[in-house]
From Swiss-Prot:
Similarity remark: Belongs to the ATP phosphoribosyltransferase family. Short subfamily.
Localisation per UniProt entry: Cytoplasm
Record keywords, A-Z: Amino-acid biosynthesis, ATP-binding, Cytoplasm, Glycosyltransferase, Histidine biosynthesis, Nucleotide-binding, Transferase
Protein name listed in UniProt: ATP phosphoribosyltransferase
SUPFAM superfamilies: Periplasmic binding protein-like II
Any one biological process term the GO annotation gives: L-histidine biosynthetic process
Subunit structure comment from the entry: Heteromultimer composed of HisG and HisZ subunits.
Domain notes: Lacks the C-terminal regulatory region which is replaced by HisZ.
EC numbers: 2.4.2.17
């Protein structure tokens, strides 16, 4: 099986867009979209293997060589800082990582005057580094979901989270005050695999480049 290429892909919209994109370069993996609990799929004819994993686990599987390639959001890569090769921006899954706060607070707030603030987020590493560069002391509360709830119940004054349309923020009375980064989906590669399977991986990268 060492001649197989293994790709780690998360479920959801990224999976659907990834299957469509790979189809454009002749790598057909439509079976990944079937209603099944299978987590590993193989295409022996094309010598490809696919692993369905949690988005936050994709970099780990690639870093340790369980997968040669992975598809994952830039937000996850920024937070985890794994030792990976990141050759390609796939240009889908666009959103923004931003700082938000209640609209009432924002009316009289000046981000340049922040000195000691409390923030709830799924991204403690990114948040800490961002505010350290600004010279702002920050207490970070790590949450795993429904980040918008934190300011509403007094857990934090502000949040750092991903926003696509901003509708969830608006419905919860929050507004964006600063953008930390623009996020898209990336192709990542295990560094050892890039050497041992260089021709096949390079062919995939160059093929995908023509369609993004």
């Amino acid at each position: 099986m060492s001649d197989f290429l293994t790709i780690a892909i998360p479920k959801g919209r990224i999976l659907e867009e990834s299957v469509a994109l790979f189809g454009k370069i002749g790598i057909h993996c439509d079976e990944l979209l079937s209603n099944t609990r299978k987590l590993i799929f193989e295409n022996r004819e094309q010598r490809m293997r696919y692993m369905i994993v949690r988005a936050t686990d994709v970099p780990t599987y690639v870093e340790y060589g369980c997968a040669d390639l992975g598809i994952v959001g830039k937000d996850t890569l920024m937070e985890q800082e794994k030792d990976l090769y990141e050759p390609l921006d796939l240009k889908f899954g666009y959103c923004r990582m931003m700082v938000a706060e209640p609209a009432g607070l924002a009316r009289d707030d000046d981000p340049s005057s922040w000195s000691n603030i409390r923030i709830a987020t799924k991204y403690p590493n990114v948040t800490e580094k961002y505010f350290a560069k600004k010279g702002v002391q920050v207490e970070i509360i790590k949450l795993y979901g429904s980040i918008e709830l934190a300011p509403l119940v007094g857990l934090s004054e502000r949040i750092v989270d991903l926003v696509s349309t901003g509708e969830t923020l608006r419905q919860n009375g929050l507004v964006e005050v600063e953008t930390i980064a623009e996020i898209t989906t990336r192709l990542i590669v295990n560094r050892a695999s890039l050497k041992t399977k260089h021709p096949r991986i390079t062919e995939i990268i160059e093929g995908l480049e023509k369609h993004v």
